[in-house]
Amino acid sequence: MRVAAGTRHDGRVRLEPVTWEILTEQLAEHVAGQASASGDGSAWRRVAVDGAPPAPTGELAEELAEALRLRGRPVLVVDADGFLRADSLRFEFGKQDPDAYYDLWYDTGALWREVFGPLDRGGDGRVLPDLRAPSVDRPTRSPHVLLPRGGVMVLHGPFLLGHWFPFDLSVHLGLSAKALERQTPVGERWRLPAFARYAEEVAPEEAADVCVRADKPRHPAWNGPPRHGSPPPP
């Protein structure tokens, strides 16, 4: 990850203050401009908004989607929680096992098959927006959604990096360990070791194209907008 000039430093990247509105607009400009720069307006764009549950990943994904629609881009927002595995698989080692939460809860194979596969070269653009409803532990039976060519898929949720998903842009909403603990409900703090492991094994603040620090929700900071022309992840 490149380092941008800024006024805050977290030990890895230098950050500068930004508003959510400016951040969203600059991300939308970048995504919309990727197709123009590549000369392939028919290719789908795939965006990650990665972060722990206390981070506003869903809110940013929806705001980014709206900004892209205003630029004439069809958008499909996908919540990773719609691809949680069945309870029998998630809770095989108990309901509060942080390693199982990290390794087993999210069905990455289904995400490859139902979300990324249809948006690959030669795909038909028919994306399954969700697979299961975790609140009732049943399949959602949602119909496939046709995302027109030139459209953008925005996937949001935790642990999105490190799987070689073919994102054209990855945004990580980071929280310091203290902020993450403070903003996590007491009954969910058993998950904290999973996020410590993610930080250690994947280093999302370095792996992502854009890093946003969201310790103070009203006062985010980031490492600056992505540069046009940078190669997509492998």
Q: What residue spans do the PLM features occupy?
A:
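NTP-dependent small-molecule kinase module
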Residues: 1-34, 169, 173, 178, ...
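Conserved nucleotide-sensing/catalytic segment adjacent to the nucleotide-binding pocket
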Residues: 11-12, 76-137
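Pre-Walker A (Motif I) flank of P-loop NTPase domains
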Residues: 41-47, 150
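Hydrophobic/aromatic beta-strand patches that form the interior of the parallel beta-sheet core
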Residues: 47, 76-78, 154, 169-171, ...
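Glycine-rich phosphate-binding P-loop
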Residues: 48-66
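Post-Walker A helix-loop "phosphate-sensing" segment adjacent to the P-loop in P-loop NTPases
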Residues: 66-76
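ATP-dependent NMP and nucleoside kinases share a basic, alpha-helical "lid"
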Residues: 137-184
